[in-house]
Amino acid sequence: GEITNTKIAGVISNNKNAYALERAEKHGIPNQCISPKDYESREIFNQEFMKAVDVMQPDLIVLAGFLVVIPAEMIAKYRNRMINIHPSLIPAFCGTGFYGLKVHEKALERGVKVVGATVHFVDEGTDTGPIILQKAVEVEQGDTPEVLQRRVMEQAEWRILPRAIDLIANGKVKVEGHRVTIES
């Protein structure tokens, strides 16, 4: 999807091999890897991570495949300005331990007929923030976790994440308590 009224201030990954870093480099976008593994303590990592983000002065932080717990003080500072994409229709198959292929394995084990993706604001819980957009994807006979993961990415995640960013960038998203409304 197309995203208007935005400029990417930078890309941070906790994985030095993330394609996002390479893609950012190719386009002249500031990028860096900051991983908890590279620091003596979680507190030091949190400080360095927050410093790196603050330097970029973002209006919106987009988490996509960033599998690190965000520091509470950062969530407070960027309240309703930090979003995440999750590969399920929250509140199903979400929370601690539900990421990547595990989400799709559990969905297939449970025998659900519909899965999907959710874009939500980040709060202090895991996948508990106000929901911005969701898109459903049908489970097909014979799906494997890998096939289902790919279909959810292509039919849902890659569509609703850019749309959510565009809506936020253009002032169309309002948060009231735990509910999100979208202006037309």
PLM feature segments, named:
Residues 1-184:
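One-carbon transfer enzymes
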